[in-house]
């Protein structure tokens, strides 16, 4: 079964998702659009910035957040092979095409873009394109960055996180989501257990969203890395 949910409904439907889908481990795929702050002028009541946190804590749930159209096609194909609940997080905002059709995609395996050793930027969804912009800008200043596309939040790719912690000087996560319980928290949990390392978390800091243009909100909440001092 496939279900499409917009911003408000994934909160209202949480009890049903928990008890009627995840508990019996039903084969239900939830495609949730209009995620994060990029719905812009719709404002705080319509900006779902807690959904990753809500969904990744549910047993049996697989959680994905794709970064472009090509990757979304791969994700839809791959989640159809999973016999169980899946949450696919999608934004309303149009995003640049990052990948060609030949890029390898595997659920639970992050994609590394670049070989830089100065910093690793872990990004998911719409923030991947922004992280790539930051990489390009910082490289002009002699700072070598690798971007890690975290298209699967759960199960998290522990191997890639540990690899980056050992190979790069700084770790940064960026997400259009509350930093409590989201991508950054997922990475911190792995680092705490397996490879204690500092992580700078960028995203919405324990607050509700605001009404405004999508790019203005991304900048306001610190999701446009090339305008920040994080690296």
Language model features with spans:
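Conserved thiamine diphosphate
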Residues: 1-120
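Glycine-rich, acidic loop regions that bind phosphate or pyrophosphate groups
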Residues: 32, 186-190, 194-208
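Glycine-rich beta-alpha junction loops
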Residues: 35-37, 92-95, 125-126, 151-152, ...
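Glycine-rich phosphate/diphosphate-binding loop of Rossmann-like nucleotide-binding domains
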Residues: 122-139
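Generic long, charged, amphipathic alpha-helical segments
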Residues: 146-164
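Short, flexible active-site recognition loops that position polar ligands and cofactors
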Residues: 214-225
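Conserved small/polar residues in nucleotide/adenosyl-binding loops
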Residues: 226-231
């Amino acid at each position: 079964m496939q279900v499409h949910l917009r911003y408000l409904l994934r909160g209202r439907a949480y009890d049903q998702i928990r008890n009627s889908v995840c508990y019996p481990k039903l084969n239900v795929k939830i495609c949730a659009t209009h995620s994060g702050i990029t719905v812009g002028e719709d404002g705080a009541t319509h900006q779902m910035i807690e959904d990753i946190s809500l969904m990744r804590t549910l047993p049996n749930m697989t959680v994905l957040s794709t970064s472009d159209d090509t990757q979304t096609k791969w994700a839809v194909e791959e989640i159809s092979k999973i016999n169980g609940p899946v949450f696919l997080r999608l934004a309303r905002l149009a995003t640049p095409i990052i990948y060609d059709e030949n890029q390898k995609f595997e659920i639970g395996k992050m994609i590394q873009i670049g070989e830089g050793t100065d910093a690793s930027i872990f990004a998911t969804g719409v923030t991947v394109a922004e992280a790539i912009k930051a990489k390009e800008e910082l490289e002009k200043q002699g700072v070598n960055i690798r971007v890690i596309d975290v298209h699967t939040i759960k199960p998290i790719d522990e191997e890639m996180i540990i690899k980056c912690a050992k190979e790069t000087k700084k770790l940064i996560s960026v997400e259009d989501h509350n930093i409590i319980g989201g991508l950054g928290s997922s990475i911190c949990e792995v680092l705490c257990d397996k490879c204690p390392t500092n992580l700078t978390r960028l995203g919405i800091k324990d607050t509700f969203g605001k009404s405004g243009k999508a790019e203005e909100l991304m900048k306001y909440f610190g999701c446009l890395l090339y305008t920040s001092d994080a690296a």
